[in-house]
């Protein structure tokens, strides 16, 4: 009898250990940037990892060394095969990741996007820094604050012709220019492909090709500092350089007066919000339009319909969480931020 009891206790212990291991595996979240080695994505990853520690969730930050569909797909497949229960990805393409993401969802993995979305049917929730209307309008307004002429020449310069988020913002920005600044001529739209060296070469090429350029609008973490550096290299103080990047990268250009205004959002908080939302999905199964989540030190966020991003697709368990605020950085406030 004593031997039988001991065997039963041993079996219960083994089952308890197995259950504990399973629970731990179910709380692993992968947080994937477009590529590693860029301050913007590193800051988002730091926020994600910090949120994971606060929640008791194991968060892994990893991405490709170059922004490619193949690189992200390989990581997604690896995380799925390793038993991760949620993946949050900044997509380099709206459709290129979809087959891999749909396979992951079929295996029970929660799929979210952050920073740059996929087609909405390929994920559950998109953690969105701002709607295209908000961010496209922000870009034009920053340029208009400096370009006072009715007739002006403007260039757009960002990462690539296929990346989801930036192309949505640029479309809205160009529409706003056509409606509100009909005398502005968009002389070129060029790309740096997330490469610092190529971005600097491209920015210098733009400035050399248009000696009378009034503004460069660069909504990309590599393109904006490259445009600022190009303006300094070529001594083009009369060009308004605006766009999106991190304050730590842009601080020297703001302090020297090369850049008067640029914008962003708190990407550290974007990483934190992403993990809180992913964790909530792991606990509840779904989040639907109208559901709210109170995140410590950030506040209340709400799931809103996909249509705020211009999509037609709506479904149960599918929507967008928009960050509560965006920031315009100037010499007066930039030292209040460290990311």
Curated annotation (Swiss-Prot):
Principal cellular location given in the protein's record: periplasm
Keywords: Periplasm, Signal
Subcellular location: Periplasm
UniProt cross-references to InterPro entries, sorted A to Z: Bact_Solute-Bind_Prot2 (IPR050555), LsrB (IPR030159), Peripla_BP_I (IPR028082), SBP_2_dom (IPR025997)
A single cellular component GO annotation: outer membrane-bounded periplasmic space
The protein's assembly and partners: The complex is composed of two ATP-binding proteins (LsrA), two transmembrane proteins (LsrC and LsrD) and a solute-binding protein (LsrB).
Family the UniProt entry places it in: Belongs to the bacterial solute-binding protein 2 family.
NCBIfam families: PRK15408.1
Function: Part of the ABC transporter complex LsrABCD involved in autoinducer 2 (AI-2) import. Binds AI-2 and delivers it to the LsrC and LsrD permeases.
Name assigned to this protein: Autoinducer 2-binding protein LsrB
Protein's organism: Photorhabdus laumondii subsp. laumondii (strain DSM 15139 / CIP 105565 / TT01) (Photorhabdus luminescens subsp. laumondii)
């Amino acid at each position: 009898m004593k031997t039988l009891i001991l065997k039963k206790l041993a079996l219960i212990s083994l089952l308890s250990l197995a259950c504990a291991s399973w629970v731990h595996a179910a709380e692993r979240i992968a947080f994937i940037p477009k590529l590693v080695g860029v301050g913007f994505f590193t800051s988002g990853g730091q926020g994600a990892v910090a949120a994971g520690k606060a929640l008791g969730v194991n968060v892994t930050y990893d991405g490709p060394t170059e922004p490619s569909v193949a690189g992200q797909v390989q990581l997604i497949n690896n995380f799925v095969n390793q038993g991760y229960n949620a993946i949050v990805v900044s997509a380099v393409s709206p459709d290129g990741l979809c087959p891999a993401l749909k396979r992951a969802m079929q295996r029970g993995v929660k799929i979210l996007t952050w920073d740059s979305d996929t087609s909405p049917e390929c994920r559950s929730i998109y953690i969105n820094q701002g709607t295209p209307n908000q961010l496209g309008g922000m870009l034009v307004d920053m340029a208009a604050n400096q370009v006072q002429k009715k007739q002006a020449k403007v260039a757009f310069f960002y990462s690539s012709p296929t990346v989801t988020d930036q192309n949505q913002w640029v479309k809205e920005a160009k529409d706003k220019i056509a409606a509100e600044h009909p005398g502005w001529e968009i002389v070129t739209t060029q790309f740096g492909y997330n490469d610092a060296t190529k971005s600097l070469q491209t920015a210098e090429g733009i400035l050399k090709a248009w000696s009378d350029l009034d503004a460069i609008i660069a909504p990309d973490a590599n393109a904006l500092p490259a445009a600022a550096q190009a303006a300094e290299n070529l001594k083009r103080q009369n060009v308004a350089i605006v766009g999106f990047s991190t304050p730590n990268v842009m601080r020297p250009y703001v302090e020297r007066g090369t850049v008067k205004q640029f914008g962003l959002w708190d990407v550290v908080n974007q990483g934190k919000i992403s993990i809180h939302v992913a964790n909530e999905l792991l606990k509840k199964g779904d989040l639907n339009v109208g559901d709210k989540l109170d995140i410590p030190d950030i506040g209340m966020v709400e799931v809103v319909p996909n249509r705020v991003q211009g999509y037609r697709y709506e479904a149960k368990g599918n929507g967008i969480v928009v960050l509560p605020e965006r920031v315009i950085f100037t010499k007066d406030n930039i030292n209040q931020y460290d990311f």
